[in-house]
UniProtKB/Swiss-Prot annotation:
InterPro entries: Bact_response_regulator, CheY-like_superfamily, Sig_transdc_resp-reg_receiver. It comes from Candida dubliniensis (strain CD36 / ATCC MYA-646 / CBS 7987 / NCPF 3949 / NRRL Y-17841) (Yeast). PANTHER family: RESPONSE REGULATORY DOMAIN-CONTAINING PROTEIN, STRESS RESPONSE REGULATOR PROTEIN 1. It comes from the Eukaryota. This is Stress response regulator protein 1. The gene is SRR1. SMART domains: REC. Residues 43-58, 128-138 have a biased composition (Low complexity). The keyword Cell inner membrane does not apply. Keywords: Phosphoprotein. The modification 4-aspartylphosphate is found at D209.
């Protein structure tokens, strides 16, 4: 029998009591660290679950930040050129945005630059765009505005004005002087004096008011047309009475034309009407 000292017996007991160590095997795994780490954390005790979970999250965040920093550092110089291009496109868009808002359909609006004078003849960008497009097809010539210039007639007429209202006399006198600057005008406010004046001097035309005291316009018209000596004299009624019955009565009394008060007629119309009346009366003789 082999004798063993106490030290050897102790070593043998310690070796036999300890579990056999598993064999060491080297396996090449394709699993990365981030997928393996959650599995390793499951082997820990239940008391340290919360601590290990928090620490693993912190490690993951830290590692993600490192990876993001590495990725940003590695791709910084690669994206530099792209960033420059993006900035160029942004600046170009900012410059072209105001012109994109200009629409041809809104042609009434005008846009002014700081150096553009505020004049009625200023051409807006819309007009320039339309003109540039239409110039290739056809050219439209805008005629200059036409101004109607009334020239006074230089005929030396002689007129008689009869009206009981002094204001109406002055208004008609001023109008006749505008139409015929060289005419001679006699104004009578008292209608009873008309017969004497007509016998004393001839007139080319007489302008009478209808509603007057003592001798009205109808009385004067009948007196004039009863005497053949005044057949070549024109007669115009200037009155507020303009109904159909009144106009028919004036025509029967020998009145050639009627101007309604107030005299809102063009100067050309009044001048041509007076000329036609006088010429027609003189041609009948």
């Amino acid at each position: 029998m082999i004798s063993m000292n106490p030290i050897m017996i102790r070593n043998n007991l310690s070796r036999s009591s300890s579990p056999a160590a598993p064999p060491i095997t080297n396996h090449t795994s394709t699993v990365d660290y981030f997928s393996l780490k959650p599995k390793l954390s499951l082997d820990t005790s239940s008391q340290n679950d919360s601590i290990s979970t928090q620490s693993s999250n912190n490690d993951d965040t830290h590692s993600d930040q490192q990876d993001h920093t590495l990725y940003t550092h590695n791709h910084y110089f690669d994206d530099d050129y792209d960033d420059d291009e993006d900035e160029d496109f942004d600046i170009r868009d900012q410059l072209l945005d105001p012109f994109d808002k200009i629409t041809i359909s809104n042609c009434n609006e005008e846009y002014y630059s700081p150096l553009t004078p505020f004049d009625d003849q200023t051409t807006s960008p819309q007009d320039s765009i339309i003109s540039s497009k239409s110039s290739n097809k056809s050219t439209t010539v805008v005629p200059p505005p036409q101004f109607q210039l009334t020239l006074p007639k230089l005929t030396t007429y002689s007129f008689l004005i009869v009206d009981d209202n002094i204001i109406n006399l002055k208004i008609l006198n001023r109008i006749l002087l505008k139409l015929f600057p060289k005419c001679h005008i006699v104004q009578i406010q008292d209608s009873k004096l008309v017969k004497d004046i007509l016998h004393k001097q001839p007139f080319d035309s007489i302008f009478i008011d209808i509603e007057m005291p003592d001798v009205n316009g109808i009385d004067i018209a009948q007196f004039v047309r009863q005497d053949s000596k005044f057949d070549d004299m024109g007669m115009v009624a200037v009155t507020t009475r303009n109904s159909t019955q009144d106009l028919e009565l004036f025509k029967q009394c020998g009145i050639d034309c009627t101007f309604h008060k107030p005299l809102n007629y063009s100067l050309d119309f009044m001048a041509n009407s007076i000329d036609d009346i006088i010429i027609t009366r003189k041609n009948k003789i």
